[in-house]
Amino acid sequence: MGGGIFGTLHPFLEGGAVYGRKVANTGFMEALLRLDPFDEYHFFVTDPDALRTAFAARDTLPGAARGAVKIFSRQDLADALRATPYHCFHLSDPVSGQPELAALRNALAPRIFPITSVNHSISYLDYAQRFLAHIWPGVTVRDAIGATSRAASKVLAGYFAQLREGYSLNPAWLRPRLEIIPLGVDPEAFPEPTPEARRAARARFGLADGEAVCLLHGRISLDDKLDAM
Protein backbone atom coordinates (compact mmCIF):
# COMPACT_ATOMS: atom_id res chain seq x y z
CA MET A 1 0.00 0.00 0.00
CA GLY A 2 1.27 3.48 0.83
CA GLY A 3 -0.32 5.04 -2.24
CA GLY A 4 -2.57 7.47 -0.38
CA ILE A 5 -6.33 7.73 -0.66
CA PHE A 6 -8.25 7.44 -3.93
CA GLY A 7 -11.56 9.29 -4.24
CA THR A 8 -14.43 9.36 -6.70
CA LEU A 9 -17.97 10.69 -7.09
CA HIS A 10 -19.13 7.78 -9.21
CA PRO A 11 -20.03 4.17 -8.34
CA PHE A 12 -18.28 2.55 -11.35
CA LEU A 13 -20.26 -0.62 -10.56
CA GLU A 14 -23.73 -0.17 -12.04
CA GLY A 15 -26.61 -2.50 -12.79
CA GLY A 16 -29.34 -2.19 -15.39
CA ALA A 17 -28.94 -2.21 -19.16
CA VAL A 18 -25.50 -3.14 -20.48
CA TYR A 19 -23.64 -0.24 -22.13
CA GLY A 20 -20.02 0.05 -23.14
CA ARG A 21 -19.46 2.76 -20.53
CA LYS A 22 -20.71 0.52 -17.73
CA VAL A 23 -18.63 -2.43 -18.89
CA ALA A 24 -15.48 -0.29 -19.14
CA ASN A 25 -16.08 1.30 -15.73
CA THR A 26 -16.67 -2.06 -14.06
CA GLY A 27 -13.52 -3.45 -15.66
CA PHE A 28 -11.51 -0.46 -14.46
CA MET A 29 -12.70 -0.68 -10.87
CA GLU A 30 -12.21 -4.44 -10.63
CA ALA A 31 -8.69 -4.10 -12.06
CA LEU A 32 -7.89 -1.25 -9.67
CA LEU A 33 -8.99 -3.21 -6.60
CA ARG A 34 -7.17 -6.29 -7.86
CA LEU A 35 -3.94 -4.31 -8.19
CA ASP A 36 -4.79 -2.44 -4.96
CA PRO A 37 -2.25 0.43 -5.10
CA PHE A 38 -3.99 2.79 -2.64
CA ASP A 39 -4.44 2.76 1.12
CA GLU A 40 -8.18 3.42 0.86
CA TYR A 41 -10.86 3.98 -1.79
CA HIS A 42 -13.52 6.60 -0.97
CA PHE A 43 -16.78 6.63 -2.93
CA PHE A 44 -19.15 9.61 -2.57
CA VAL A 45 -22.30 8.47 -4.32
CA THR A 46 -26.03 9.17 -4.47
CA ASP A 47 -27.03 5.60 -3.55
CA PRO A 48 -24.56 4.17 -1.01
CA ASP A 49 -26.64 1.07 -0.28
CA ALA A 50 -26.70 -0.01 -3.93
CA LEU A 51 -22.93 0.34 -4.15
CA ARG A 52 -22.41 -1.62 -0.94
CA THR A 53 -24.45 -4.44 -2.49
CA ALA A 54 -22.32 -4.31 -5.65
CA PHE A 55 -19.10 -4.52 -3.65
CA ALA A 56 -20.43 -7.35 -1.48
CA ALA A 57 -20.42 -9.48 -4.63
CA ARG A 58 -16.75 -8.60 -5.20
CA ASP A 59 -15.40 -9.10 -1.70
CA THR A 60 -12.59 -11.35 -2.93
CA LEU A 61 -10.84 -8.47 -4.71
CA PRO A 62 -7.83 -7.52 -2.56
CA GLY A 63 -8.82 -3.90 -2.07
CA ALA A 64 -12.32 -4.86 -0.99
CA ALA A 65 -11.28 -7.92 1.02
CA ARG A 66 -9.09 -5.90 3.39
CA GLY A 67 -11.84 -3.33 4.04
CA ALA A 68 -10.19 -0.47 2.14
CA VAL A 69 -13.38 0.47 0.27
CA LYS A 70 -15.26 3.24 2.11
CA ILE A 71 -18.67 4.24 0.80
CA PHE A 72 -20.19 7.61 1.72
CA SER A 73 -23.15 9.73 0.77
CA ARG A 74 -22.48 12.61 -1.61
CA GLN A 75 -23.49 14.88 1.26
CA ASP A 76 -20.34 13.83 3.12
CA LEU A 77 -18.04 15.14 0.39
CA ALA A 78 -17.39 18.67 1.67
CA ASP A 79 -16.36 17.55 5.16
CA ALA A 80 -14.16 14.81 3.71
CA LEU A 81 -12.39 17.25 1.40
CA ARG A 82 -11.60 19.51 4.35
CA ALA A 83 -10.24 16.69 6.49
CA THR A 84 -8.56 14.26 4.09
CA PRO A 85 -5.37 14.82 2.04
CA TYR A 86 -6.51 12.85 -1.01
CA HIS A 87 -3.97 11.50 -3.48
CA CYS A 88 -6.37 11.91 -6.40
CA PHE A 89 -9.99 11.78 -7.54
CA HIS A 90 -10.90 9.85 -10.66
CA LEU A 91 -14.33 10.10 -12.30
CA SER A 92 -15.99 7.67 -14.66
CA ASP A 93 -16.52 10.35 -17.33
CA PRO A 94 -15.63 14.03 -17.87
CA VAL A 95 -19.19 15.34 -18.22
CA SER A 96 -20.50 14.50 -14.74
CA GLY A 97 -19.05 16.74 -12.08
CA GLN A 98 -15.37 17.24 -12.88
CA PRO A 99 -15.38 21.08 -13.00
CA GLU A 100 -17.64 21.27 -9.96
CA LEU A 101 -15.37 18.94 -8.01
CA ALA A 102 -12.37 21.08 -8.98
CA ALA A 103 -14.10 24.14 -7.54
CA LEU A 104 -14.82 22.33 -4.27
CA ARG A 105 -11.25 21.03 -4.13
CA ASN A 106 -9.80 24.49 -4.60
CA ALA A 107 -12.04 25.94 -1.90
CA LEU A 108 -11.82 23.21 0.74
CA ALA A 109 -8.95 20.75 0.29
CA PRO A 110 -5.74 21.10 2.34
CA ARG A 111 -3.88 19.54 -0.60
CA ILE A 112 -4.64 20.30 -4.26
CA PHE A 113 -4.91 16.78 -5.66
CA PRO A 114 -5.31 15.95 -9.38
CA ILE A 115 -8.77 15.21 -10.79
CA THR A 116 -8.96 12.87 -13.76
CA SER A 117 -11.62 11.17 -15.87
CA VAL A 118 -11.93 9.17 -19.09
CA ASN A 119 -14.12 9.79 -22.11
CA HIS A 120 -16.83 7.47 -23.37
CA SER A 121 -19.41 8.81 -25.83
CA ILE A 122 -18.46 12.22 -27.20
CA SER A 123 -21.16 12.84 -29.80
CA TYR A 124 -24.11 14.20 -27.82
CA LEU A 125 -25.24 17.73 -28.66
CA ASP A 126 -25.07 19.08 -25.11
CA TYR A 127 -21.47 18.00 -24.55
CA ALA A 128 -20.06 21.28 -25.86
CA GLN A 129 -21.83 23.08 -23.03
CA ARG A 130 -20.45 20.61 -20.50
CA PHE A 131 -16.90 20.90 -21.83
CA LEU A 132 -17.13 24.69 -21.67
CA ALA A 133 -17.21 24.40 -17.87
CA HIS A 134 -13.77 22.73 -17.99
CA ILE A 135 -12.04 25.92 -19.21
CA TRP A 136 -11.58 28.21 -16.22
CA PRO A 137 -8.88 29.54 -13.85
CA GLY A 138 -9.40 26.77 -11.29
CA VAL A 139 -7.98 23.97 -13.45
CA THR A 140 -4.49 22.77 -12.50
CA VAL A 141 -1.78 21.33 -14.73
CA ARG A 142 -2.31 17.88 -13.18
CA ASP A 143 -6.03 17.69 -13.99
CA ALA A 144 -6.62 15.46 -17.00
CA ILE A 145 -9.11 13.70 -19.24
CA GLY A 146 -8.11 10.31 -20.57
CA ALA A 147 -8.98 9.85 -24.24
CA THR A 148 -9.47 6.23 -25.26
CA SER A 149 -8.09 6.75 -28.78
CA ARG A 150 -6.19 9.24 -30.92
CA ALA A 151 -9.48 10.04 -32.66
CA ALA A 152 -11.20 10.80 -29.35
CA SER A 153 -8.29 13.00 -28.27
CA LYS A 154 -8.53 14.93 -31.54
CA VAL A 155 -12.28 15.45 -31.11
CA LEU A 156 -11.89 16.62 -27.52
CA ALA A 157 -9.08 19.00 -28.46
CA GLY A 158 -11.34 20.35 -31.20
CA TYR A 159 -14.14 20.91 -28.71
CA PHE A 160 -11.88 22.93 -26.45
CA ALA A 161 -10.32 24.95 -29.29
CA GLN A 162 -13.72 25.82 -30.74
CA LEU A 163 -15.05 26.83 -27.33
CA ARG A 164 -12.04 29.07 -26.65
CA GLU A 165 -12.46 30.80 -29.99
CA GLY A 166 -16.25 31.02 -29.93
CA TYR A 167 -16.44 32.48 -26.43
CA SER A 168 -13.21 34.55 -26.64
CA LEU A 169 -11.92 32.89 -23.49
CA ASN A 170 -8.81 34.07 -21.70
CA PRO A 171 -5.84 32.15 -23.18
CA ALA A 172 -4.35 31.87 -19.68
CA TRP A 173 -7.27 29.75 -18.48
CA LEU A 174 -6.33 26.09 -18.43
CA ARG A 175 -8.40 23.09 -19.35
CA PRO A 176 -7.67 19.49 -18.32
CA ARG A 177 -4.84 18.07 -20.37
CA LEU A 178 -5.63 15.18 -22.70
CA GLU A 179 -3.84 11.87 -22.25
CA ILE A 180 -4.40 8.98 -24.68
CA ILE A 181 -5.17 5.86 -22.62
CA PRO A 182 -6.57 3.07 -24.82
CA LEU A 183 -9.12 0.66 -23.41
CA GLY A 184 -7.51 -2.60 -22.36
CA VAL A 185 -8.65 -6.16 -22.89
CA ASP A 186 -8.52 -8.76 -20.13
CA PRO A 187 -6.79 -11.75 -21.78
CA GLU A 188 -8.42 -14.12 -19.30
CA ALA A 189 -11.91 -12.89 -20.17
CA PHE A 190 -11.16 -12.72 -23.90
CA PRO A 191 -8.50 -15.35 -24.68
CA GLU A 192 -7.09 -15.56 -28.19
CA PRO A 193 -9.06 -18.26 -30.03
CA THR A 194 -7.33 -21.39 -31.20
CA PRO A 195 -7.25 -22.09 -34.95
CA GLU A 196 -9.94 -24.71 -34.40
CA ALA A 197 -12.19 -22.26 -32.54
CA ARG A 198 -11.65 -19.63 -35.24
CA ARG A 199 -12.63 -22.10 -37.99
CA ALA A 200 -15.69 -23.16 -36.01
CA ALA A 201 -16.79 -19.54 -35.60
CA ARG A 202 -16.37 -18.89 -39.32
CA ALA A 203 -18.32 -22.02 -40.15
CA ARG A 204 -21.12 -20.92 -37.83
CA PHE A 205 -21.62 -17.77 -39.90
CA GLY A 206 -20.94 -19.40 -43.27
CA LEU A 207 -17.61 -17.65 -43.84
CA ALA A 208 -14.80 -19.13 -45.91
CA ASP A 209 -11.32 -19.38 -44.38
CA GLY A 210 -9.86 -16.58 -46.51
CA GLU A 211 -12.92 -14.32 -46.49
CA ALA A 212 -12.37 -10.85 -44.97
CA VAL A 213 -14.53 -9.97 -41.98
CA CYS A 214 -15.15 -6.57 -40.39
CA LEU A 215 -16.21 -6.85 -36.75
CA LEU A 216 -17.89 -3.80 -35.23
CA HIS A 217 -17.37 -3.48 -31.47
CA GLY A 218 -20.00 -1.27 -29.89
CA ARG A 219 -23.64 -0.49 -29.38
CA ILE A 220 -25.92 0.26 -32.32
CA SER A 221 -28.87 2.55 -31.57
CA LEU A 222 -31.19 4.22 -34.07
CA ASP A 223 -31.10 7.58 -32.30
CA ASP A 224 -27.47 8.05 -31.26
CA LYS A 225 -25.21 5.13 -32.15
CA LEU A 226 -25.20 4.76 -35.93
CA ASP A 227 -21.63 5.95 -36.49
CA ALA A 228 -20.83 2.87 -38.54
CA MET A 229 -23.58 3.69 -41.03
Model-inferred region functions:
Residues 14, 50-54, 97-100, 125-127, ...:
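Short catalytic/ligand-binding loop motif for oxyanion handling, primarily in non-cytosolic enzymes
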